[in-house]
Amino acid sequence: MLSKKNFYINGKWVIPHQEKELHVINPSTEESCAIISLGSSEDINSAVSAAKKAFESWAFTSKEERLKLLESLYSLYKKRWNEMAEAISLEMGAPIDFSTQLQAGTGASHIKSYLKVLKDYKFEKILGDHAPNNKILYEPKGV
């Protein structure tokens, strides 16, 4: 049985503020297949605070840096494809072949979509030929 009781906040695994757990039930066996921690408002506040802090530097990353990070994430996802399929199969009670062939692909498809959007996205729009120096810049706003 899987036991995942810590949260990844601010670049490290941390112990939740409260010891409240949930047994994840596999619908196909009706048995507990994992134990996870339930977050408190303190955990949520810590995560949001960390995200806001991370945004300060993330907002200044270039398109190329973001593409490189997303490509690394996609590569890692593909390497751990079978682990994803096993986790999905346990949680949803789906046959492993179905999880491996279809459901695990959903996460990979999302990452590929983000890559395509980022590659094609125009962060700068010239308002017209008559005023080539007049531009609209699209910049990150926040978390």
Where are these regions (language model features)?
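N-terminal Rossmann-like NAD(P)+-binding subdomain of aldehyde/semialdehyde dehydrogenases
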Residues: 1-133
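Short, intrinsically disordered, charge-balanced linker/junction segments flanking boundaries
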Residues: 136-143
